[in-house]
Amino acid sequence: MKKINKIKIKLNGKYIKIQDRITLFNLTKKFKVPINKVAIELNQVIVNKKSLDKIKVKKNDKIEIVHFIGGG
């Protein structure tokens, strides 16, 4: 059986361990994030949602997921 390597990242200010080389898209699926209602920042750069399945998370990355909240 193949061992899954884990890496440490910072997600919304908290350190977590996740599968190495996971894409941002799969990370959002893992945490049930509604990608149409959030902005995702990777190492202080806003990520284009069309790129989520192409960008692989790396060790020590800092990811912020910000939810949009409507108001009036």
Predicted regions and their residues:
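Ubiquitin-like/PB1-type beta-grasp interaction modules and other compact soluble beta-rich domains
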Residues: 1-71
